[in-house]
Amino acid sequence: MGDTGFYRRRFRIRIVRSLNGTVEFFRKASRDLLFNVSQPLSSGVEKIVQNIGKVRNQGVEIDLNYQVLKSKDWKLSVGANATFINNKVTRLPDANRKDGIIKDSKKLMEGHSIYEFWLRQWWGVNPDNGDGLYIFDAENNTDANGNIKDAVKKTLVEKDGQVLTNSYSYAKYDFSGSAVPKVYGGFNINLSYKAFDLSTVFSYSLGGKVLDSSYRGLMDVGEFGYAMSPDLHNAWTTPGQITDVPRLDNNSDHATSIGQSYSTRWLTNANYLNLRTVTLAYNLPKSILNVINIKSARVNVSAENLFMLKARQGLNPQANYAGVSYNEYMPAKNFTIGLNVSF
């Protein structure tokens, strides 16, 4: 991979005496990135690694600090940072410029992010019979005269003026959002009263998408002997029932179509708010330190990853920058007691 250009410019700002920070603009263009590129069946290999294309990353980073309160006994300050980034493919080889390059759940296409999902378009559950329905791909499932094959017609149904199919084989693919968040960053709160200090650090992300492959596996009724999600209790059972979980049966084609196929059904927002650290500390007073002949002593209790607000229980949206979550562990909760002494 080579860089064709890198630009970074930082500005320091001070709005009022107690509010200051920095604003930094950046832009980086890269070429000859490594990607797995699908090959024709006649080649004898499924994919090969190639140096292809150009990608541009640009955005702005903002870092602000504000002294809210400062008195003899009390001090309160807050800080926050935010990064806004835009990722875009600016050039592909001539042979791939029209149709792009499909790479697992993504599609490389000029004008789109390398982390933008390319997935079957899930519509929902047919309330009449519990079938899982996809938006029908008419463009690739008709002949030159615009006629649909009889085998395909049997899978079709019309809902709300839209032609749908109960087979993932005839589902329409489309761009479905990016794993790159609109904004991400963190903020902190620091409070002190006399000898006590309390500090917290949060991290957050807004606007990205994540393909929850772990949840897909838990909802797959075609797999026997595996753990299953309690959401399967919401499966369709009665005509007219409105639900987002298709009916459960032992038809292998039905199970494959609704469970094993990757689609926007398994795509969810990757927004999160994580309380990363909380620390409470006490600084021993001079009256005690002088007696035991110590310069300073500080006792602290801290906790990490106390909670995370997110779209779905068990999902860890920050585990994978590419936006695919599969058997990822949640951040472990850690508790620490510390003593710092200076002689």
How would you name each of these model-derived features?
Residues 205-297, 303:
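Extracytoplasmic gating/loop element in the C-terminal half of outer-membrane beta-barrel translocons
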Residues 52, 56, 98-117, 177-186, ...:
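C-terminal extracellular loops and terminal segments
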Residues 50, 67-177:
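Conserved small-residue
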Residues 1-114, 258, 262-343:
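Extracellular/periplasmic, surface-exposed regions of secreted and cell-surface proteins
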Residues 176-212:
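Glycine-rich, aromatic-lined ligand/substrate-binding cores of catalytic
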Residues 40-47, 101-106, 114, 118-122, ...:
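Surface-exposed, low-complexity loop segments enriched in small/polar and acidic residues
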Residues 38-40, 44, 57, 97, ...:
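Short capping/connector residues at structural and topological boundaries
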